[in-house]
Amino acid sequence: MPTSTKSKTKTTTKKKTTRKRVTPGKNLVIVESPAKAKTIEKYLGRNYKVVASVGHIRDLKKSTMSVDIENDYEPQYINIRGKAPLINSLKKEAKAAKAVYLASDPDREGEAISWHLAHILNLPLEEKNRVVFNEITKDAVKNAFKEPRQIDVDLVDAQQARRVLDRLVGYSISPILWKKVKKGLSAGRVQSIALKLIVDRENEINAFIPEEYWSIDGEFKKGTKKFKASFWGIDGKKHPLKTNEDVIKVMERLDGPDFNVDKVEKKERRRNAPLPYTTSSMQQDAANKLNFRTRKTMMVAQQLYEGLTLGSQGHQGLITYMRTDSTRISPVAQSAAHNYIADQFGEKYSKHGSKVKNASGAQDAHEAIRPSNVFNTPDAIAKYLDKDQLKLYTLIWNRFVASQMVAAIFDTVKVNLSQNGVIFIANGSQVKFDGYLRIYNDSDKSNMLPEMEENETVKKANVKPEQHFTQPPARYSEATLIKTLEENGVGRPSTYAPTLETIQKRYYVRLSAKRFEPTELGEIVNKLIVEFFPNIVNTEFTAEMEKDLDEVEEGKRQWIEVVDQFYKPFAKELENAEEGMEKIQIKDEPAGFDCDVCGSPMVIKLGRFGKFYACSNFPDCRNTKAIVKEIGVKCPLCHEGNIIERKTKKNRIFYGCDRYPDCEFTSWDKPIGRDCPKSGHFLVEKKVRGGGKQVVCSNDECDYQEEKQK
C-alpha cells in the first residue's frame, strides 16, 4: 500500500475497491472528538450514528525517522499504539453502515485524518464521503451533508510534506545535539527560528547603550481652559534636545507668559474597524487583554467551537473553526451582523456588503474566527459558560461585530505656539462619530483643545523639562513573538502554540515577567544551529518554503519535489555538523554545600523542569534535592515548618510546607505570616487585575481584604 497520496505524476495510486456490506444500517459519521460527535449526532437525527476517532489513528513511529529517504521520502505510517480496539470498532461500524462520512476538521490535519481513516476502512478515494463545515450549527452541518466531496489529496499532500520535513529536520539534528551537548534536546523548522528570535533580541538588549535625551512639556491657558503642548523646535526647525545644555538654551529664550498662536490645522481622520480574528491575532489579543497563555487560548477556543449546552437551545457550536489565517466572512454571517447592528445601533453603523482583502498566503477555504450566531450575545449566554469561555467568547464576539461596523471619525486639531522662535505644538482630537467604537473599546481617548485662532495669544502656565534615556527593545512576549513569526511568514495557525510550548519544555527559554528570556542551554543550541544549519533559522528561506508548501496544497507542485529540494542541501549540512561540531560540556554550578548521603559536594544541574541539586558523585550516589525558595513565613497548618516556593511540572508556582510529607499544607497564593482579624484563617497575597497585589483572607467565605499595593 503506497503511503503517499499521489505519485510524482499526480496519478492517484490507490485502486478502487468494492466493499461487501451487510444489511444496510445507519449512516456512519466519523469526527475527531467525542464532544463534536455528541453535538453533530443531535443535528443529524436517528438515521446517523456519529463516532469519534479521538484525533489521528495512524502516525509516524516515534522511535525512528520513519521516512524512507531512498524511496521518494515515503512516510512509514503505523497504527497508533493503544488504538487497536477503536480501529476494530470503526471497521465493524463501517462494515454495517449504509454509508460512511468523514467529518474531521476543515484543515490540513483534518484532511489527513480523513485520508488515514479511508485507508484503514478501505474506502475508495473516488468516493464522495468527505464532509466539511466551518461551524458546528444545525444549518451548517445539514448543508454540508448535502454536498459531500472527495478527499482533497492536494491538502493531504501539503500536510504530509510538512510532517516529513519536520521529521527530517527534527530526527536528523536532534541526535547530533544529543551527542554534542546533552540528551533530550531538539530542533525544528519553526521552533529553531523562534529560539533565534529570542536569543537575537537578548543580544540586542545586552549590547544596548542608553542615550540621554530631554523633553519640555508645557501647560497653557486659553481663558479658563488649560491644555498641554510639547516643545518641538526653534526658528521653524525641529530641534532635538540631547543634553541639559540644549534645554538651558531653550529655556533662556523664553520670556514672559504670552505665546502666539502661529498656526491652527484642522483635519477629519477616519479609523477603520479592525479585521475579524485569525488564529494568530486572536492569540495575541487573548494574551494582551485576557492574560491567556497561547495554549489556554486554543484549548478554550476548541471548547467554544465544539459546542456547549445553552438551555432550551440545546448543544450549540459557538464559534467558527479556530485554526485559520483567513479574514473572510460568509455573506450569511455578514447579513446577520448587519441585521444585529442595524437593530441595536441603527443602519448608519453597519458596513454591510463591504469586501475584505485577505493577507498574502491566507488559506481562504476557511472563514475568520467569528461567533456562529451573532444574536447569541455574551450577556445572553453568560450563565452557560465558565469564566474563561465567557472572556474569550466576548473577545471574539466584540471583534466580529466591530469588524462589520463603519469607521470611527475624529476631528483633529494641531496648534503651533511660539515665543521668541521657540515652538511648542499641541495636538487634540475629538470623536465626531463613534462608528465601531460604539462596541469596541479602544485605547485612544478624546483630548479636547480650547477653540483657538491664528495670531491670538495664549498664556503659559508652567514649563517642565524632563530627562530621559532611550530604552532597549523589549523581550518578546507570547503575543509579540507570534506576531513576529507571522509577519516573517514562518509557521501556520496550528504551529504557534506547540512551538512556544516546546521551547519552554526543552528549557531553551524561560518566562520572566511574561517575557521570553533565553537560558544558557538555549543560547548554546541556537549558536550551533546558526553555525551549522543556517537555512533552518533563515526566516526568508523558511517563508519561501511555506509558499512552496502552499503551492502543493493548491495542486501546483508535487510534495516529493518540494521535500527533495530542501533535503539535498540539508544532507550536506548534516555531514558538516557531524564532523565539525565540537562537543560542548555544560559545567555544573557548585551548590555550596555537601551531600547529606555521601559527603561529596552538591552541584546545580539542569533538568527537564529546570535546575535542581544533585550529588557530584553520580552515578555512585544518586542523591538529588529540589531547589527551594523560603519566603520567611512559618507554616500556618503545623506551625513548625517553613513555607517554601515550589513549582508544578507545568511550571506554576505554589507554596508548601518544607516538612512535607509530614505536613501536607499547600496554597496557590502566597501566605504572609498573619491571621485574618475576622475569621482567624491565614492571610494570603493575591495578584489583582491591572497589576499590583492585595492581602485577602484565605477563607473564601470571608470578605476581609486590605488596600491594594502597587
From Swiss-Prot:
UniProt-annotated catalytic positions: Y321
Zinc-finger ranges (C4-type): 595-621, 635-663, 676-702
Ranges where the record places region Interaction with DNA: 186-191
Biased composition (Basic residues): 7-22
InterPro entries in the record: Topo_IA, Topo_IA_2, Topo_IA_AS, Topo_IA_cen, Topo_IA_cen_sub1, Topo_IA_cen_sub2, Topo_IA_cen_sub3, Topo_IA_core_domain
Keywords annotated in UniProt: DNA-binding, Isomerase, Magnesium, Metal-binding, Repeat, Topoisomerase, Zinc, Zinc-finger
Site (Interaction with DNA): H56, R162, R163, D166, Y171, W178, R323, R506
GO molecular-function terms, A-Z: DNA binding; DNA topoisomerase type I (single strand cut, ATP-independent) activity; zinc ion binding
Spans annotated as Disordered: 1-22
One GO term (biological process): DNA topological change
Assembly: Monomer.
Function description: Releases the supercoiling and torsional tension of DNA, which is introduced during the DNA replication and transcription, by transiently cleaving and rejoining one strand of the DNA duplex. Introduces a single-strand break via transesterification at a target site in duplex DNA. The scissile phosphodiester is attacked by the catalytic tyrosine of the enzyme, resulting in the formation of a DNA-(5'-phosphotyrosyl)-enzyme intermediate and the expulsion of a 3'-OH DNA strand. The free DNA strand then undergoes passage around the unbroken strand, thus removing DNA supercoils.
Family: Belongs to the type IA topoisomerase family.
Protein name per its UniProtKB record: DNA topoisomerase 1
The encoding gene: topA
